[in-house]
């Protein structure tokens, strides 16, 4: 009888261990997220005590409150307290009083690693991929969007994360917590609805040639996505230009204007001193899909354009122009003209010629642009007072891969309501030639 009890207890323990292992496995592999990357210091805080463990297992206790972790002389410091020269782990002594990084809570483990010849640090958050996605998807889409659009975003974000696990790019971590990787907000960014839909697609991954895809995504395409080769110069088979239904996006169309002096100054600050701006050379924007050209991609996004100056001409990529001028995207037309008023103030007189009031008469905004001289693909200044450069564009982001507002548009179609797992149709539209599989 005693032996039977021992065996029963043993099997129960084995089953519990197996259950815990299976549960952990169902959350996917661990991913290391760079929260604070290559900085001189970072703020850690907790309402309770924090245990700091160095690479040799030595422990130091930090009191409740805020502490600044920094690197000096190849060693870590917590405020003025000297710590180890190796990597550090931070553990809350009370689980109900977690450690915060720059006042944000995170699941999983927190460590600090040295970078830049032991002069700077990176704070890393290691946690299962599925739990990581809880803090990503809610930051990337509006949580109350159609379920199928959110599921598509979840699969794209998961595929992107798994791709980076297979293709190490950084020292000490796998992916950044910013838009240079995927925007990740930790526990406080999570939303019950997006978490539910991440769980509904658990493990589902977009795959091409047997490996997770580099599932780029963006907010708004402006009507047509772009092929990767026309944005980054690298042909990726599954990232091609496709038509997009994102017209409901607030960034579907936009206009920004700059004076000559503003453009000249911005170019100079970026290392391109062209002197006085005289004109801009760029193939006119046509209807997508556009035929191949050296200036524009299939969607019409700018691949390159030339600023003509009194000192020299400079040719920049569309991405460089977008970054320098702070444009929403590289999908734009350029015109030169004057910023005319939106309305004219007109006097209203009675039958006797006396003014009885005034009225603002609106002016068609189309008359505000296009005053400059245009010769082929060259826009020149006409020399009139207050001329500006107008960028009339569409979309938000690089325009490659899944369009978040476009996915929403597809999910709202009638056909989407009749088809189960329509998120798969959405993914196959934006990522050509992929297949979907459960990786865990």
Which residues are covered by each model-predicted region?
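Conserved, single-site charged/polar hotspot
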Residues: 2-440
